[in-house]
């Protein structure tokens, strides 16, 4: 289809003359350098023809080909972040120095239920992601598109919910720089609109 052959992808090494990082972007106020997005300026940049990937007009094809694996990668990152948040939630819940009304935090209110729900939701996200990855490996991105679309929605939402619960059990400390939770929440929130 000609309309999908209008773009090309070219590798441009960062040390190429004329390539300039104007500034790194922040994510909810957190510096995302060096792995995040940047405002770039390209002034009369020249690269060898060999830097053209796959061939002229095949940029859309490359982008589409990486979407499925990229989304699975992001979901795996979400699951890893949620696992860390759940572990922090559990530790905080049984910390003997954090007691209220004679009970540890896990036994107050709905905290015990939140911990259990988080484990269930996290396992569901993990199994859906593994299923999507297995299907992509065996039958390809196009046939696995439904499973990949499901995890793109489900895994980041589950991770955000679990991180939010972990923040809640940590109280004010959860939104501070004393734990990784606030940063995790900010970066995880960006996964919902990407891809």
Please name every model-derived segment.
Residues 1-87, 91:
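FAD-binding core of flavoproteins
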Residues 39-44, 58, 64-195:
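Alpha-helical interface subdomain recognition
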């Amino acid at each position: 289809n000609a309309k999908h052959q209008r773009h090309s992808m070219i590798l441009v090494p960062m040390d190429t003359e004329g390539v300039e990082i104007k500034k790194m972007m922040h994510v909810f106020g957190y510096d995302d350098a060096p792995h995040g997005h940047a405002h770039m300026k390209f002034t009369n940049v020249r690269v060898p023809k060999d830097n053209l990937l796959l061939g002229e007009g095949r940029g859309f094809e490359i982008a589409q080909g990486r979407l499925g694996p990229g989304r699975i990668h992001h979901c795996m990152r979400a699951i890893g972040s949620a696992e860390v948040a759940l572990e922090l939630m559990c530790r905080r819940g049984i910390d003997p120095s954090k007691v209220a009304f004679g009970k540890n935090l896990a036994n107050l209110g709905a905290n015990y239920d939140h911990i259990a729900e988080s484990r269930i939701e996290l396992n569901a996200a993990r199994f859906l992601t593994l299923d999507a990855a297995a299907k992509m490996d065996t039958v390809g991105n196009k046939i696995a598109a439904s499973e990949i679309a499901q995890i793109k929605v489900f895994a980041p939402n589950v991770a955000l919910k679990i991180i939010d619960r972990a923040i809640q059990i940590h109280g004010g400390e959860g939104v501070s720089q004393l734990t990784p939770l606030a940063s995790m929440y900010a970066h995880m929130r960006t996964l919902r609109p990407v891809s």
